């Protein structure tokens, strides 16, 4: 179990998948991300895309803090069940949960005309995801993101430096113990 830290649903508990399939983002890190995006005004009314959603905690934290809508993408069936449960418990209707491999789902979103739709994109891929696969995912995000969109990637602190695809511009990287939050922004 984990909880939402701030905003409308602050203090509400969320289920997390059992086992080691997912690695829920720590409350401290979700709070830091939420605070950073709120401070820049990026969350108010934002459309959020949460890639590798796991329990949905990261995206739901942002929804709680002022985002207007959330699309959560996850491929693991147990995690999908958990994120759907968490959405149901919070009684939010502005959430769409999509099942499947992230790269495949991004292509489907682009094909259905979801271009320039998302104001904030968060990605918490498995720490073992090859850099080439992450680069492919980030490149696929570009046509789906709105001008000025924030893109935030959670990575292990031992990961190679993140290479942002053009035109995403690196803003900063913050370290929290064994975790890095890498912030980028589209022009």
Feature locations, PLM:
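Class I S-adenosyl-L-methionine-dependent methyltransferase catalytic core
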Residues: 1-187
């Amino acid at each position: 179990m984990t909880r939402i830290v701030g905003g409308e649903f602050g203090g509400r508990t969320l289920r997390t998948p059992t086992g080691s399939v997912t690695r829920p983002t720590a409350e401290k890190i979700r709070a830091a991300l939420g605070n950073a995006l709120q401070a820049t005004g990026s969350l108010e009314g934002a459309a959020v895309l949460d890639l590798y959603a796991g329990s949905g905690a990261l995206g739901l934290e942002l929804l709680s803090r002022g985002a207007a809508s959330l699309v959560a993408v996850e491929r693991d069936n147990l995690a999908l069940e958990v994120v759907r449960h968490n959405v149901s418990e919070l009684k939010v209707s502005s959430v769409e949960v999509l099942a499947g491999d992230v790269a495949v789902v991004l292509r489907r979103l682009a094909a259905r005309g979801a271009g320039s739709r998302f104001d904030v994109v968060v990605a918490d891929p498995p720490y073992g995801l090859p850099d080439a696969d992450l680069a492919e995912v980030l490149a696929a995000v570009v046509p789906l993101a709105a001008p000025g969109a924030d893109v935030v990637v959670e990575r292990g602190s031992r990961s190679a430096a993140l290479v942002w695809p053009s035109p995403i511009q690196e803003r900063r990287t913050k370290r929290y113990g064994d975790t890095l939050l890498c912030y980028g922004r589209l022009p």
